[in-house]
Amino acid sequence: MSFRAILLAAAASLSLVTAAAAQPIPSTADVAKQRVFANIGLLNSECIRYDAANDRYLISNLGARGLENNGYIAVMSPDGVIVNQKFIEGGRNGATLIDPLGIFIENGLIYVADSTHLRKFDLLTGAPRGEVALPGAGRPNDLFATKDGTVYLSDNGGLSGTIIKVSPTNQVSLLQPRDDIMEKPNGVAVLADGSIVHGGRGVNISYRDASGNLLREKTMPSGMFDAIVPLADSSLLIASQGGRNVYKMTAKGDVSEVAKEITVPGAIGYDSKRNRLLIPQTTAASITFVDLP
């Protein structure tokens, strides 16, 4: 084969690979149907979670940037109205909220990743219910609490990241030593089989066993992940800041897009009663509703 023929064959092969890589993923996203709620009293709104027991949404707000104790958690109704702007407020009623990022609802508690602590509040009253210092933590971000009271927090601060584990007796350990291979994890969740799934600055969604051993990875169309939300059918909702969208990935690994043109999707939530995706944006201080098909 001549050199020219080799070049042409290589170019053709590269074109096929590029074309395959460029194939669009299935999408049900419709920007016209994405309802945005802005200018509603939020300030640096990072995370939203559905409180199924009380049919309401809880939203963490960093408040003014800095180390002041001025973060807060707002309550939104399912029709998009803020019914209690500062249900829990740093500096009031004994609450400390300096830089509240991820929140999670379980066991009648609101768990909050805040600065170098895991904080707990009563779900009904908002009263403080304890806190756990996280020695060596850089920036605890997202979190997931299991029914037995174990909490997993992503830490993407510092030069490398990890997953912090807090036992039901408040013992703190690392699921995996700090290492670049963790890709500075942000979104973290625990699946029905007990495995831990996380995603961070890269394009891989990683699965680990309870001892931190890597089980497998799934490469996504885009990365820079925020929250990961497991659904009842074992699929996952995954926020991608790199793609400015939200993916749904089935248990078999099939990926589709369910929301798009979200400038910086934060720690998403899911309303199981309405089959609704909830998307916060921190800087925009907004919430987007996406009713899923």
Report the location of each language-model feature:
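Bacterial N-terminal signal peptides
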Residues: 9-15
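Blade/loop signatures of beta-propeller domains
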Residues: 23-32, 71
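Asp-box/WD-like beta-propeller blade repeats and closely related beta-sheet repeat scaffolds
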Residues: 32, 117-148
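A short beta-strand motif characteristic of beta-propeller blades
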Residues: 32-39, 82-94, 127-133, 171-179, ...
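Beta-rich, blade/repeat-based domains predominating
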Residues: 41-54, 70, 90-109, 135-154, ...
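Short loop/turn segments immediately following the C-termini of beta-strands
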Residues: 62-64, 115, 156-158, 200-202, ...
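A short loop-to-beta-strand structural motif that recurs across blades of beta-propeller domains
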Residues: 69-74, 117-119, 161-164, 204-206, ...
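Short loop/turn segments that connect beta-strands within beta-propeller blades
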Residues: 76-81, 122-127, 166-171, 209-213, ...
